[in-house]
């Protein structure tokens, strides 16, 4: 009995351990299933090619793991944080006459450049420590930026929830009914996703973004059979009818507009990536302790390397035509549940994702999802992004009674949200169209640096005064 109990405690795989082939394959498939819904959702929302997005996530993951010397088991997937910036850029008047591939090419350049933000942050952390980054990007900036990323997408979510865009068979006299039924589909998707996320446990609890849309599609199918109203999207003429086809690769096109729009958003992913590496450190060291491993897995000390890997992932994804991304918390949770942290598993998962991206029938099924289903999902996801921003400030115990903090948070929030709803996402400023989220982030960073000058001096004076008083007290006692 004692031997059996001891054996049970040692179940699991550390980053440098490799399961047997059949286990390796099963664990890898599980990781693909976990990352799939969110990665695909970003492609559907931004208009990027689904097949290319899936392929890019796999390729970027392999590059991330190799660059981090196979020490950090994280999966790279598309990030919702960039959706506003990419969407505003691709919908801008400057690119109005461009084809989809031309718009993606412009966005790619901004995505590649955003990778430099994470790389620079990583180098700073490696050289000066984590505190150096937190001085420039405190929670009073990263939190509100995450909030406005979510809130500026609220209009898109509600519009898509009742949209008939690219829908199939909808007659003119059925438009009113079809719109109402689209609301039903989006609400079913939203509520089922929420219920699944709250009540499902274990590995199943990591898949609400998969199960919610499936239920929404089932309702859309019932509506089609009962009323003849087809809410499923019509495939474009460019859709392949074969079994296998290579993803659509595009080359980046240099554009300063893309740099201004997308590059600053990388600051919002740094706290998330930081939290992930510390979370992973706890899980892996706990498993190592239970397995009585003599090796130390100090992942918390590899934050700089992790950020550099993230930046390289963005550059790789952007170069082939995929959206910007980050390492996925969903995959960390799946690893924590199964206690499988093997980097070999993630490499195989990445290869499987790249193979799946070439399977045309699956890609076509994903593309045909009703816009209402996507809209219902967006309500939950975009709200979650905003909530994450609040969580960042709560976790860092931001002083909401500080005049400086209130000033920084207030201006970021209003510039970001106001710019979206007053000017459609791009704020006109001296002949330039400044993307609202990027503009708010840059303004917040500069304002925080300016307002930090006075407090630093006051703090130094207070510290000097305290030291002087201590010396006087010591002299009095000595005498």
Regions found by a protein language model. Name each.
Residues 13-15, 19-22, 44-65, 268-343:
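Membrane-embedded helical hairpins/re-entrant loop segments and their flanking transmembrane helices
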Residues 2-22, 45-48, 83-101, 348-477:
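Transmembrane alpha-helical segments and their short flanking loops
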Residues 66-76, 132, 197-208, 338-343, ...:
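Membrane-helix interface "capping/anchor" motifs
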Residues 37-39, 75-82, 322-331, 344-345:
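Transmembrane helix boundary and interhelical junction motifs in multipass membrane proteins
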């Amino acid at each position: 009995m004692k031997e059996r109990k001891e054996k049970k405690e040692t179940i699991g795989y550390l980053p440098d351990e490799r399961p047997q082939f059949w286990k390796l394959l099963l664990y890898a498939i599980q990781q693909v299933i976990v990352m799939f819904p969110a990665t695909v959702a970003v492609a559907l929302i931004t208009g990027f090619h689904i097949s290319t997005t899936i392929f890019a996530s796999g390729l970027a993951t392999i590059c991330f793991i190799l660059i981090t010397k196979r020490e950090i088991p994280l999966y790279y997937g598309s990030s919702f944080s960039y959706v506003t910036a990419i969407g505003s850029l691709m919908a801008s008047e400057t690119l109005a006459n461009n084809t989809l591939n031309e718009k993606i090419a412009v966005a790619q350049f901004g995505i590649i450049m955003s990778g430099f933000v994470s790389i620079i942050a990583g180098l700073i952390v490696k050289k000066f420590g984590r505190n150096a980054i937190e001085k420039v990007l405190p929670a009073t900036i990263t939190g509100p930026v995450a909030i406005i990323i979510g809130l500026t997408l609220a209009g898109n979510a509600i519009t898509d929830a009742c949209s008939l865009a690219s829908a199939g068979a909808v007659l003119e006299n059925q438009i009113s009914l079809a719109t109402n039924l689209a609301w039903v589909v989006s609400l079913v998707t939203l509520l089922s996703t929420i219920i699944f996320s709250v009540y499902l446990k274990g590995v199943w609890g990591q898949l609400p973004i998969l199960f919610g849309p499936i239920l929404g599609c089932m309702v859309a199918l019932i509506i089609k059979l009962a009323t003849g109203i087809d809410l499923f999207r019509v495939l474009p003429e460019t859709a392949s009818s074969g079994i296998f086809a290579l993803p659509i690769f595009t080359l980046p096109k240099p554009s300063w507009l893309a740099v201004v729009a997308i590059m600053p958003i990388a600051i919002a992913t740094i706290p998330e990536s930081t939290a992930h590496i510390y979370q992973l450190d706890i899980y892996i060291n706990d498993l190592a302790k239970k397995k009585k491993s003599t090796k130390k897995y100090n992942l918390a000390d590899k934050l700089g390397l992790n950020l550099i890997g993230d930046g390289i992932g963005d550059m790789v994804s952007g170069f082939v035509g995929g959206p910007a991304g980050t390492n996925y918390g969903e995959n960390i949770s799946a690893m924590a549940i199964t206690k499988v942290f093997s980097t070999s598993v993630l490499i195989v998962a990445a290869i499987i994702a790249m193979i799946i991206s070439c399977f045309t029938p699956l890609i076509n099924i994903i593309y045909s999802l009703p816009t209402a289903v996507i809209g219902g999902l967006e309500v939950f996801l975009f709200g979650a992004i905003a909530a994450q921003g609040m969580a960042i400030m709560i976790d860092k115990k931001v002083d909401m009674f500080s005049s400086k903090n209130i000033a920084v948070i207030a201006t970021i929030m209003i510039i970001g949200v106001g710019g979206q709803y007053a000017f459609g996402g791009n704020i006109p400023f001296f002949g330039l169209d400044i993307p609202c989220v990027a503009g708010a982030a840059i303004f917040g960073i500069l304002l925080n640096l300016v307002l930090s000058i006075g407090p630093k001096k006051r703090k130094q004076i207070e510290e000097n005064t305290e030291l002087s008083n201590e010396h006087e007290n010591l002299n009095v006692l000595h005498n």
